[in-house]
């Protein structure tokens, strides 16, 4: 089990925002690191969703509730307002129908928390300036094997939220 200090930086930020004893849906939960930490340290009731079989196995081995599903078709298995928080961490850039998933997140949850690789971050821009696609902790793939299909900045994401009548809250 990861201590708060060893959580990935974005997961640490997310964990800090989630109140104890909350209901959490973690979309694209990967190995379940966030959910496992939240259940152990904040007594949350959580469900993870991922499409990858190895991720599902890792979550099950940790004793987490997890569903293997493709989020691209929506979250129809969940009722409106089922969760206090819906998390989408480092996953949105690999999805085709971003507007649908954002709508669905806010349908099934009271609060949506989204993190993504910021391609406008100065270190990423510097790598592009010197002729290389960015590779970092949050963008660990080479250009030829990346699942990322959307490359956005915080301003781009804020503009998308504005189209949907939402705004960016950065605590």
What spans do the regions from the language model cover?
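Conserved alpha-helix/loop element of class I SAM-dependent methyltransferases that forms part
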Residues: 5-21
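Alpha-helix C-terminal capping/helix-to-coil transition sites in glycosyltransferase folds
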Residues: 20, 81-82, 108
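Conserved class I S-adenosyl-L-methionine
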Residues: 22-30
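Residues at the starts of beta-strands that form the adenosine-phosphate
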Residues: 23, 45, 111
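Class I SAM-dependent methyltransferase SAM/SAH-binding core
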Residues: 33, 37-74
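Short conserved loop adjoining the S-adenosyl-L-methionine
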Residues: 74-80
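A short SAM/SAH-binding and catalytic strip from SAM-dependent methyltransferases
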Residues: 85-97
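S-adenosyl-L-methionine-dependent methyltransferase catalytic module, highlighting the catalytic core
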Residues: 100-104, 111-171
């Amino acid at each position: 089990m990861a201590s708060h200090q060893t959580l990935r930086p974005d997961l640490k930020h997310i964990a800090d925002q989630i109140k104890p004893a909350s209901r959490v849906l973690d979309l694209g939960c990967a190995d379940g690191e966030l959910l496992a930490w939240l259940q152990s340290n904040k007594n949350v009731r959580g469900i993870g969703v991922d499409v990858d079989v190895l991720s599902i196995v890792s979550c099950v081995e940790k004793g987490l509730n997890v569903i293997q599903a493709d989020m691209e078709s929506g979250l129809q298995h969940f009722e409106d307002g089922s969760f206090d928080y819906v998390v989408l961490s480092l996953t949105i850039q690999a999805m085709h129908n971003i507007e649908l998933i954002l709508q669905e997140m806010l349908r099934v949850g009271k609060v949506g928390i989204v993190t993504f690789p910021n391609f406008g971050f100065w270190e990423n821009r510097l790598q592009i300036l010197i002729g290389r696609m960015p590779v970092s902790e949050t963008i660990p793939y080479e250009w030829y094997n990346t699942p990322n299909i959307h490359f956005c900045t915080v301003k781009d994401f804020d503009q998308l939220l504005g189209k949907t009548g939402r705004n960016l809250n950065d605590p």
